[in-house]
Structures are given as C-alpha cells and as structure tokens.
Amino acid sequence: SVLTQMTRLHQITCGHVKTDDGEVRPLKNNRIKELLQVLEESDGKVIIWAVYRHDIQTIEKEIANEYGRETVASYYGDTKDDVRQSIVDDFMDRDSDLRFFVGNPKTGGYGLTLTCSHTVVYYSNDYSLEVRMQSEDRAHRIGQKDKVTYIDLIAEGTIDEKIVKALN
C-alpha cells in the first residue's frame, strides 16, 4: 500500500528499515551524527522526540556512549508504567545528571511537564499536527522561564520535507 511505502521511506531516512517479517535492519545513518552535533551545541536539558522504537533505542545507546548512561532516559511504549514518573521527576530535577529525555511523542507528548528544557529536537515526525503541538507543549507551558527552541532533523529531498510541510 501507499502508506506502507511512505512508512518505509520514512524509516530509511531515520536510519533503519523494518522488513515484512518484522526484522529491523539498521542502515547507514547520518541523522544520528547530526543529532549528536546538535546536542554538543546545546546547553541544559534536551527533549528528543522520535517516532520509531528502534530510533529511540539507538538514540539512547548513542547518547549513553557519548555522555554516560546516567545522562539519558527513554520514555515510550516499552517504558514500564512504574518507571515513567521517576524518569519525569529525575529529568525535572535541575541537579540531576539526567540531561536527555528521549521519547515517542504519542507516549510522552501528552500531559507531561518538561519545562526544565528549553531545547526540543525532533529526530523524526509523523503526520499528526495534534501530536506535534502536544509534544511541543511539554516544554512550552506554565513554568517555562526561557524561550524554547525547536529543531527538526530533516534529510533534504526526502519524505521528511513532505511531513514537516504537512505539519505547517
């Protein structure tokens, strides 16, 4: 179907592809290098949103390798319910070593307060404007004292551009 083809194209731009039998195959991925460059240039705590489970796991692993395991936590469908609030509490604690919140915007984009961050990176987007707006509002809400910067990682000439255009 067209939707399946579009999803596969999007996965490829993110650095992996899921085969028909459910196997995830990593691909050469410059996006993760770009993300690490953005993080190096960012100060303070950073929220990173990604659509795919494999991307969230890869991002968490790469950040842990670069900055240390204690600096990153992931928040997505596989995150146990009893751990989720402690991740948010730890991230909101300005004295905590937890600097990077990596999440799926459908899982973590609703109801959370993450105002300790003024940098939000979209590693990938989906077509839902509602999901995008809700995830943006995690950092930009009452309690935020700084201007929030939103960064979209976009591979030129790919489906990324179409998705971001649809969101605008």
Regions found by a protein language model. Name each.
Residues L112-N125, V148-D152:
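A short beta-strand element within the Helicase C-terminal
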Residues I59-E62, L112-C116, M133-Q134, V164-K165:
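Short amphipathic alpha-helical segments
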Residues Y127-N168:
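A conserved SF2-helicase RecA2
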Residues G108, D126-Y127:
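Flexible glycine-rich beta->alpha loop in the catalytic core of nucleotide-sugar glycosyltransferases
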Residues Q11, G77, N125, L153-E156:
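Active-site donor-binding loop signature of nucleotide-sugar glycosyltransferases
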Residues F101, T119-V121, A139:
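Short, well-ordered beta-strand core segments
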Residues W49, G103-N104, Y122-S124, L153-I154:
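Conserved beta-strand segments of the P-loop GTPase G domain that flank and frequently precede/overlap
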Residues S1-L112:
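Conserved Helicase C-terminal RecA-like lobe
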